[in-house]
Amino acid sequence: MMLPMSSACSGGQFPGASPHGIIPKQFSRAPRIRVSIRGAAGVEKSLGLGRNAGSQQGMHKNELHDKIRKQLRDVQLQPSSYDTAWVAMVPVQGSHQTPRFPQSIEWILQNQYDDGSWGTNLPGLVVNKDILLCTLACVVALKRWNTGRDHISRGLNFIGRNFSVAMDEQTVAPVGFNITFSGLLSLATRTGLELPVMQTDIDGIIHIRKIELERDAYGTASSRRAFMAYVSEGLGNLQDWNQVMAYQRKNGSIFNSPSATAATIIHGHNYSGLAYLDFVTSKFGGPVPVMYPQNAYSQLCMVDTLERMGISESFACEISDILDMTYRLWMHNEEELMLDMRTCAMAFRLLRMHGYDITSDGMAQFVEQSSFDDSIHGYLNDTKALLELYKSSQLRCLEDDLILEEIGSWSARVLLEKISSKMIHISELPEVEYALKCPVYAILERLEQKRNIEQFKTKEQLKIEGFKLLKSGYRGVIPNDEILALAVDEFHSSQSVYQQELQDLNSWVAHTRLDELKFARLMPSITYFSAAAVLLPSESARIAWTQNCILTTTVDDFFDGEGSKEEMENLVKLIEKWDDHGEIGFSSECVEILFYAVYNTSKQIAEKAMPLQKRNAVDHIAESWWFTVRGMLTEAEWRMDKYVPTTVEEYMSAAVDSFAVGPIITSAALFVGPELSEEVFRSEEYIHLMNLANTIGRLLNDMQTYEKEIKMGKVNSVMLHALSHSGGGRGSPEASMEEAKREMRRVLQGCRFELLRLVTRDAGVVPPPCRKLFWLMSKVLHFVYMEKDRYFTAEGMMASANAVILDPLQVTLPPSDSGTL
């Protein structure tokens, strides 16, 4: 996500890199500890369930922040023994007896493990195919220049002892292992190496390569050509090297792969790639990574991970720098960003959600399914790239954005096909199913973050992973353990805050006497969950949001039949008069309780916001309440008079305001950002945002509850649309409720697109933090009405609320050797 020499990132360094290479580090091991964070009455103030079991048994919180911040600013890449070996085999141009990169040979000599192997061979890690591949490559490289006789001997002994691993089809393997490993075996034989392996076993491995080259079991012809170019070093003279050069990047590399680039040079077809290898070996002091550059992908992954784990706010400055640089890469159509499907899609998603002014034009290259099928991603069944495309397609801001529409259509279809045909790896299946079930616009951040924390992989769990799309095991130096520790600590701290705020809200309910209203669906936990789950930034914003959710729900129930016509008219007049309510009086105790709950709470919110707003903004809250109850009264009068609006438009003129988003957002907006002037609240933009949010809520509600509301004698947009197209010569008599719902979904989709466009654009009268509230409200509404009206069947909502506020995390923290957070 960064240019190589950007200020935010130097472009990637190996930890401890020097001209003499990197000495492998040995890591201590200890039993892991199960950590459970209890909520409610059983809140644990620490995560201590064993030795040093704090929020992270190990580093101080500041040290964790510093390590993550360092990785964000300066990508740390693991050296690849496999790729370094191939680079070491490149001769000086015109002299096949002299190595072009002696520093790479020196690194190989200095980085052999005691057991004779090369690669990622940490204590406790079982010998795998990646280690065998790296070891054979390094042995062949040393033999190529007749150096390191003892190293070669120890390496050959290691290969002989573990060769059975190469033949084990159940062992995880790097991409293209059957081709790259057998190619090295052939090369080893030609260089005179005597492998301590039965010739029949060697022949068996080479035969596997022959079978793979002859069959067409994987992908399309185009994807197969791309894949064979990617693993071309394993093909030797079997490769069409002119065809490989079609995949050369501007930097001279083949797929940004040092090994593939080195192979094309060795075979005399890519001397322009020498500049690429010169740069990479110079930058890292001899060794090379498995892919370079990969700054953009590495940093975008870090940003995405921090956001998904709920700790991105602690790194806002670094993330801003990364996204600024990513935006520049995007605008300049840089290959590092645009030529990799997963990187491009992730960049688009993050940039759009952070308000950068980009169109979907950069995604046009993926508008056809063939963009996946004919690529390496398709050949390797790369589900993660496909899933990233699907996620990005959901961020449409324009109804006529056919690019994202087409991407979303085919990517969802392919993912579903892969699920039904069981072509998705078991470890990836939950994430795919979750993404298909829960679209981006219906995900509540805190709920998803808890899920991500509990499923997050530590470094220990990642030891046998990381082979996707890479020829040698790439694990990077992403501080997974530190990220997990901070996320657990932050979630635990947040739960303590949430529980205290919920207690305060329960006290407020009693103080306002709302609990005396028998009809009131108060549900403080569920309503507070909607504020906590979307990560409203301050306590005051969460409290104001929740109080008004409770109030609007209670008032809505009052207008739905619990109040008489006289009482309803009385409440509307009281709210209209506001401070002069004493002139009117109360028609009942119920009206008095409702009015004073609304009135006093609104005044308290406005007074609390005065230090931020530099004025008393209670008039805006009062006005939003008046619009709300006026719409509710109109709907109640329709119901009591058995009047059916003649058009959907007439119905929506009251139903939009009556959905009651106004008081909730207006109150919370006073606490989320800069001062909101009179002009902001009166602006066309603010009014349009409010109308969109209310319309989204109304349509979602109507589509889920129309059957119940018809029985209650209430009108509904779905029913009205069906009626308007079923008789009187005004439309098709065959129109049905399902057809009406489809039309409402189309209108809903258009409103959602327009809302996202307004929220993510980089200009506007309404400040971005305030605009974001409308999108958060839309996400809550989509979540609530995703399957059914969860306010009437609240088990699912209560379970979700408990997950965020009360239920303990179930997570395993890695061991550490020093202090706690």
Swiss-Prot record:
Motif (DDXXD motif): 556-560
Name of this protein: Ent-isokaur-15-ene synthase
Annotated EC: 4.2.3.103
Family affiliation: Belongs to the terpene synthase family.
Organism: Oryza sativa subsp. japonica (Rice)
Binding positions for Mg(2+) 3 per the UniProt entry: 701, 705, 709
Keywords from the UniProt entry: Lyase, Magnesium, Metal-binding, Plant defense
GO molecular function term, any single one: magnesium ion binding
GO biological process, one term: diterpenoid biosynthetic process
Cofactor names: Mg(2+)
Catalytic activity: ent-copalyl diphosphate = ent-isokaurene + diphosphate
Binding-site residues for Mg(2+) 2, renumbered to this chain: 556, 560
